[in-house]
Amino acid sequence: MTTNKQVIFKDHVSGFPKESDFNFTTTTVELRVPEGSKSVLVKNLYLSCDPYMRSRMGKPDPSSALAQAYAPGKPIYGYGVSRVIESGHPDYKKGDLLWGIVGWEEYSVITPMAHMHFKIQHTDVPLSYYTGLLGMPGMTAYAGFYEVCSPKKGETVYVSAASGAVGQLVGQFAKMMGCYVVGSAGSKEKVDLLKTKFGFDDAFNYKEESDLSAALKRCFPKGIDMYFENVGGKMLDAVLLNMNPHGRIAVCGMISQYNLENQEGVHNLSNIIYKRIRIQGFVVADFYDKYPKFLELVLPRIKEGKITYVEDVADGLEKAPEALVGLFHGKNVGKQVVVIARE
């Protein structure tokens, strides 16, 4: 038996989440799994803060095809990196590392499931990368860019929220394909990162642009072939005016809308017809069968320094609520990670 610190979800949220929507508590856990079960006891090392988690904070919505609401009074959960302490599962043994869905706590008891938990085979890269670059956000970038957008060399690519966990990798994939890529972000520091660290051809601070369509026209005088959508709202409206005929839009997220009581409408949808634009929403879970192919692409390039990644690290489980809430105010620079234990 040992103590187990946890981040508890207090109650369903409307509007922007606050740190006060969570409790920090300490309970106890037995360091063993029930005899005969296929459960695995893990020690959580790193936690991932992701925008999709906001969709789980509202009241349960029977009409939702995806998000299952967090239960008040229970630990919230998300992607993390963990070490196996004890296992009743045939595929995992003590000492194994994995990434996947775990509770926001020091120790979790999980039942590993395909496409929800992945054994870590490559440990010659930072383990924290499996919360981002080599985990769900990395696979999201890969699926949206290669599988949904079907890119071609020489095409033009626009990425919103481009300095985040997904966007920074989409931009690098685009450059690897020989595309012209522009990103937007919400601060000078982030814009500079896009151009100096991630190799974007151009970037702009959307907060300093009074006319988003004009900003896109400036960056894409010949139009946009592919848009990796992370924002929604006014940005999507402006993009539709600047898309080329037969352009493709991969809809990954709409972070500008998640905390609004009434979501903003999009007014330029007729462009989809006249320009024959293909818009496709996607969920990364539909593409996890391609994870080995994804690793074959990115692992060598990480080791060769051809792919780089920026993390914003919060130390300690007690910092997790602040880190998660900050995500929705643009406070993170790069992938937001919470370190529980460094091993």
UniProtKB/Swiss-Prot annotation:
Catalytic reaction list: an n-alkanal + NAD(+) = an alk-2-enal + NADH + H(+); an n-alkanal + NADP(+) = an alk-2-enal + NADPH + H(+)
GO cellular component: a single term: plasma membrane
Binding site for substrate: Y52, Y79
Any GO BP: response to oxidative stress
Keywords: NADP, Oxidoreductase
Residues binding NADP(+), per UniProt: 164-167, 190, 206, 230, 252-258, 282-284, 332
Molecular functions per Gene Ontology: 2-alkenal reductase (NADPH) activity
CDD domains: double_bond_reductase_like (cd08295)
Function statement: Catalyzes the reduction of the 7-8 double bond of phenylpropanal substrates, such as p-coumaryl aldehyde and coniferyl aldehyde (in vitro). Has activity towards toxic substrates, such as 4-hydroxy-(2E)-nonenal (in vitro). May play a distinct role in plant antioxidant defense and is possibly involved in NAD(P)/NAD(P)h homeostasis.
The name this protein goes by in its record: NADP-dependent alkenal double bond reductase P2
Name of the gene this protein is made from: P2
